[in-house]
Amino acid sequence: RIGTSTDVPAGAIETTGALNYLGRAAEYDYNAWWFCSFPTDAVKEVGLPLPLFIHGDDIEYGIRLNSYGYKVFCPGGISVWHESFENKHLTWIRYFDFRNALIRLALHFDNPPKIIIRQLKHVCQRALIRNDYGAYIMAVKAFEDFCKGPEILSLTNFSEQIKSLDDLYHEYSKVDSSGRYKLSNEELSCQKEKKIKTAMRYLTANLHSIPIPSIRHFRTSNTRFSWTDVPYFSDITVDLANGNQIHYRRNLKKYRSLNKRLRI
């Protein structure tokens, strides 16, 4: 099957029309730098990409091109292989993902304060449900720096900045490569649930405010597992391709500490 957002049916590639789909030149809102194309005259009119250092600069540029009436195409037959995103454990880079998303929202959308606050709450809520307190603090740090203004983009000491962000992330979320996680309670995999239960999970951050310790163990090999898969009162283990594990343990003390830092 070609992706989850296409209408190409599952089946043998020569019988489903997938070859025609892969070979077409498709129009999109943006493309990653390594396979996008646009007129050179467009650069003269809309200017150069923003100095965002990493992640999201291609998204902003695609949106900017579209706002000037330039189309962005993905030429068929061009691809670059890289490691699956499912096997990548995202730490400090979450800061740049969210900070640059805030910049993009401020530049290209109406009523940006309302949208930005909503996005911040959404990102933090999902991080809490996943017990990923490091991702939460990256979003808060990104928001704080965004509020300081465009001067933050003039920083060039990237090595120091990344080390500081990485230390901050691991202060809240740690990777354990020394052994296997031990928990006597039941181990659960992904299960479908009713929409009302999913809504309750989101609104209460998976019942984080209730002072009950972990009673379940959710395990997956996908580093980008969905917050909707996590059962109530669960510790989480992610098995990495290299044999290491990531443990996201439910921690009410960290939850309360982070909530105090972010008051909206």
Task: Report each predicted region and the residues it spans.
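A conserved hydrophobic position in a structured secondary element of the catalytic/binding core
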Residues: 38
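Terminal low-complexity segments of carbohydrate-biosynthetic enzymes
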Residues: 99-264
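Donor nucleotide-sugar recognition loop
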Residues: 30-35, 44-63, 69-75
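A recurrent flexible, glycine/aromatic-enriched loop bordering the glycosyltransferase active site
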Residues: 7-35
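Active-site donor/metal-binding and catalytic loop motifs
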Residues: 75-91
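Conserved donor NDP-sugar-binding/catalytic core segment of glycosyltransferases
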Residues: 1-7
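Hydrophobic alpha-helical scaffolding
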Residues: 52, 87-94, 126-133
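Catalytic-core region of carbohydrate-active enzymes that cleave or remodel glycosidic bonds
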Residues: 48-51, 63, 67-68, 91-111, ...
